[in-house]
């Protein structure tokens, strides 16, 4: 029995370490890359442009730089990816945002249906400079959550801010449950 435990216990620990490592990696691996091109699912609204940038990045050597004159939007139109994420209980959106100029205003993230309804949304406070992480579950977002037929994410420029830019990186619409620890901060109260 003692000899058997000597082999079984390390095997169990190795299995658990492998499983935990895979879950953690799946939760944080960026699904959308800005290394070689801007994915076709991104569409800039009027008064804005998007380009790849090596100026500020979190993963690899590039991020998505979005510059705008208000009002404007940046849309992500990948119905399939959004639906796969929304079907997972406890899933959500994860990204990093670099803000070069702090403003006392909120950027709105709206998950919209094909008819323009907004069952999920959140505001991200922009009174910071540098990088900030944004991890939020769909079920923690305000909204009526009545529809699961989300077809796009629309990011809207902050009200009262004439122009600006920000950098996005490590954008992921998780397809696994995010951890349950709620960590509100100044960006997402």
Residue ranges and their predicted role:
Residues 68-144, 161-167, 172-177:
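Extracellular ligand-binding interfaces
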Residues 52-74:
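Short carbohydrate-recognition loop motifs
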Residues 25-47, 177-189:
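Extracellular carbohydrate-recognition regions
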Residues 1-8:
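N-terminal secretory signal peptides that target proteins for export/translocation
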Residues 143-154:
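Noncatalytic modules at the cell exterior or secretory-pathway interfaces
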Residues 27, 45, 57-59, 86-90, ...:
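Short, surface-exposed loop/turn motifs at beta-strand boundaries within globular domains
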Residues 9-21:
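Bacterial N-terminal signal peptides
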Residues 154-162:
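Short beta-strand-plus-loop segments that form exposed binding edges in beta-rich domains
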